[in-house]
């Protein structure tokens, strides 16, 4: 459900239309996601908490010994063992407090950054499509999030639309998953759009750290809340095997605009 968290929640609300006092029970390890915080803050929500210690009698002895020894009295243990909803996830590179909102200043350069999904099936990742800008003061701005789950033709058309809508200078796309295909998709929609392919030659942690540092240094802002992007930024851990689409697009976009991306080629 975490992959489709807001969709799952929204659909669940539609099932509560009958009866005099419909209610629902939501149980989860409280990851610091925007939607979970919204639910907790809702005045109609009654919050109860349980801890791993409440359930020790039902857990395997070796599990109890290993998990409690490893996580007891740690910040990760506050979430995983004590069931606390933390403001920030321990070990995450991004923090909620570093994300600020303001109107965009005059922009010096704009790009549409794409992290293409490998497949377009129902359970596939979305294709991350972010519009990134750097203003005349040298600050980075997230201008739009047009990420979607769809076919190459669908995300190609959306990316080109965003390029024209925001008067971008170029489209930047990760080429590790089919560089020639990406170029073909975009050029089929509009042959005049400049495309820059970028290749991941180092690990994501190494690529992500400089962009996360821009946020910590107050050199970044969002023109409005982007809940899905912000959840990915603030819950991704460097050892996480998953590859969040919006986060990747964010890294590629601002590496291009503010950090001088390497290992890339114009086509």
Predicted regions and their residues:
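Conserved RecA-like P-loop NTPase helicase motor core
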Residues: 245-248
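Conserved Walker B
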Residues: 1-2, 117
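An active-site-proximal beta-strand-loop segment
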Residues: 114-127
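ASCE P-loop NTPase helicase motor core
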Residues: 3-71
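ATPase catalytic-site recognition across NTP-hydrolyzing enzymes
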Residues: 56-117
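Acidic two-metal-ion nuclease catalytic site recognized across multiple nuclease folds
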Residues: 253-267
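Catalytic phosphate/metal-binding cores of nucleic-acid and nucleotide-processing enzymes, i.e., regions
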Residues: 10-11, 17-24, 82, 87, ...
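Mg2+-dependent endonuclease catalytic cores in nucleic-acid-processing enzymes, primarily RNase H-like
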Residues: 111, 128-239
